[in-house]
């Protein structure tokens, strides 16, 4: 659906499976720098930028750099209230989850062949799984295992998340599922709502999980296209 309205560039983030490896010391600028290079290589000076979780946080960082015409952030990371240390527990869970999936990944296709396997595989990211192809879920499982989680988690745990919100001057829509088990609504959005981006267009998706693009793909696409068309 998005391709009918926009030229789509979908770069894989540094340190994520299928993307360039992390090189050098991890820093706040490392991943946004790489996305900017991908935009430059593709000829995009600015773009309507969409991201989920860490990708949503990166989208907002790119907006602060003046690279976004608009941003749609789906449950962006980094929104815990100042002083809320629970984000460290969340980051630790990502590392633990990767360890658990590493043992299961060689059997990904067999796991996803059953409805129960697909339900368990999506329990932290989506509330609706029946429509998601088994092949995609197997690919996602192997993708999680292929991420360089440890150095990114170590950096974020130590340094936290920052956003120069005053420099985010483009329109921003933030979409959050009320049944998000990884970044729970509304606590994981507190700093975005109260300090950084209270003026954003906020959309709550009742009963939806952490990855709306998997949970309700058509509605997610409509929320993106409807916002970029303004």
Model-derived segments and spans:
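Conserved alpha/beta-hydrolase catalytic His-Asp/Glu region
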Residues: 106-167
């Amino acid at each position: 659906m998005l391709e009918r309205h926009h030229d789509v560039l979908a770069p894989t983030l540094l340190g994520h499976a299928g993307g360039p490896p992390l090189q050098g010391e991890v820093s706040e600028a490392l991943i946004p720098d790489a996305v900017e290079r991908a935009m430059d290589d593709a000829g995009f000076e600015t773009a309507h930028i969409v991201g989920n979780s860490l990708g949503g946080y990166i989208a907002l960082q790119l907006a602060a750099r003046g690279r976004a015409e608009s941003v749609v952030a789906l449950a962006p990371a980094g929104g815990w209230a100042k002083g809320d240390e629970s984000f460290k527990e969340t980051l630790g869970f990502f590392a633990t989850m990767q360890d658990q999936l590493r043992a299961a990944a060689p059997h990904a296709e067999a796991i996803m062949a059953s409805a129960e396997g697909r339900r368990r595989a999506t329990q932290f990211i989506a509330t609706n799984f029946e429509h998601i192809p088994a092949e995609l879920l197997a690919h996602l499982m192997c993708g999680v295992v292929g991420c360089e989680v440890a150095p990114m988690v170590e950096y974020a745990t130590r340094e936290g998340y920052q956003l120069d919100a005053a420099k985010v001057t483009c329109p921003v829509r933030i979409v959050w599922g009320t049944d998000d088990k990884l970044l729970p609504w509304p606590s994981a959005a507190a700093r975005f709502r109260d300090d950084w981006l209270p003026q954003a267009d906020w959309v709550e998706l009742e009963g939806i999980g952490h990855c709306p693009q998997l949970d309700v793909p058509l509605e997610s696409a409509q929320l993106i296209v409807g916002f970029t068309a303004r």
